[in-house]
């Protein structure tokens, strides 16, 4: 994945089979996530200085800058998403978190084949797509929201789908899929392009379906307004259960300076389906219901 000698320890760990996440807490501790289980591994770094230099190089490959004046950085590379935090006044060690992007599209039939979903759920999910009604996929971090969203969107290659993400994860293979990616401000505080800005632009791009990788802020309200005006929309949202989706929507509305009950009513009228994904042991569990 990386050919630079400074990044060899990271490349070695990422090359291991089944690794979906890799984290470092300082130079001496590393852990990998395989099949939803964490295990400690040898880091391969010999000093904090060596590790910090590797982190700076990795972030720079992603077109970002990290230093003591700006000790935090996120970067999106071809196959991984990186978040780094240099040792500074707020933390004693340099930290690195790497999420590996899925290397292939997972079809709903594959989820069914490995007993992740039932035949009835597969049929209902296809009904959600065929209805061209808007939906939200909820779940906690690492539950598989993006994986399920990718599987859903891959079911219909004839749609013109516009995806909007802060880091590229969906990576749909359809030729008529447009991928828009938000951009953080540079070290001078300039050049930021938000999810909400991209969403507004996407409304003018003749989409059959608009999808936001994850809604966290103002883009949720804009997406609900677009859906209520007839656009077919989809997104993921962090929530611990399907019952907590409404509270999460109200929380985002409040943080975005909107009246929460008003936005909750808008969500009720514009989002037709709620899909919740969770992990129980080694299996994913789905709950699909009408938003009534």
Regions found by a protein language model. Name each.
Residues 38-131:
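P-loop NTP-binding catalytic core
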Residues 142:
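Walker A (P-loop) phosphate-binding loop of P-loop NTPases
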Residues 148:
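Hydrophobic positions on the alpha1 helix immediately C-terminal to the Walker A/P-loop
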Residues 268-292:
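Conserved P-loop NTPase
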Residues 137-139:
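Hydrophobic anchor at the beta1->P-loop junction of P-loop NTPases
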Residues 135, 151-269, 276-279:
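Switch/coupling sub-region of P-loop NTPases
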Residues 145:
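Conserved lysine of the Walker
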Residues 1-21, 62-69:
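Phosphate-interacting basic helix/loop segments used at nucleotide- and nucleic-acid interfaces
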């Amino acid at each position: 994945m990386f050919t630079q000698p400074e990044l060899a320890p990271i490349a070695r760990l990422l090359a291991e089979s089944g690794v979906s996440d890799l984290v470092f807490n300082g130079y001496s501790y590393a852990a990998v996530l395989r099949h939803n289980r964490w295990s400690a591994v040898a880091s391969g770094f010999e000093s904090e200085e060596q590790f910090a230099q590797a982190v700076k190089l990795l972030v720079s490959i992603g077109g970002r800058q990290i230093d003591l004046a700006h000790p935090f950085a996120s970067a999106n590379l071809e196959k991984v998403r990186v978040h780094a935090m240099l040792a500074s006044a707020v933390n004693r060690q340099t930290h690195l978190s790497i999420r590996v992007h899925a290397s292939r599209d997972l079809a709903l039939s594959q989820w069914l084949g490995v007993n992740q979903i039932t035949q009835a759920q597969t049929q209902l999910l296809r009904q959600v797509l065929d209805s061209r009604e808007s939906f939200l996929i909820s779940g906690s971090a690492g539950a598989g929201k993006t994986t399920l969203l990718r599987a859903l969107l891959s079911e219909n290659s004839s749609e013109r789908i516009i995806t909007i993400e802060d880091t590229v994860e969906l990576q749909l293979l359809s030729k008529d899929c447009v991928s828009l990616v938000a951009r953080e401000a540079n070290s001078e505080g300039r050049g930021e392009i938000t999810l909400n800005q991209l969403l507004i632009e996407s409304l003018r791009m003749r989409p059959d379906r608009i999808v936001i990788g994850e809604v966290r802020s103002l883009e949720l309200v804009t997406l609900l307004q677009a859906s209520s005006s007839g656009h077919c929309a989809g997104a993921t949202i962090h929530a611990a259960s399907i019952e907590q989706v409404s509270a999460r929507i109200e929380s985002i509305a409040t943080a975005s300076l909107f009246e929460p009950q008003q936005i909750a009513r808008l969500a009720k009228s514009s989002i037709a389906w709620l899909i919740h994904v969770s992990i129980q042991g080694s299996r994913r569990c789905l709950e699909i219901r009408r938003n009534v």
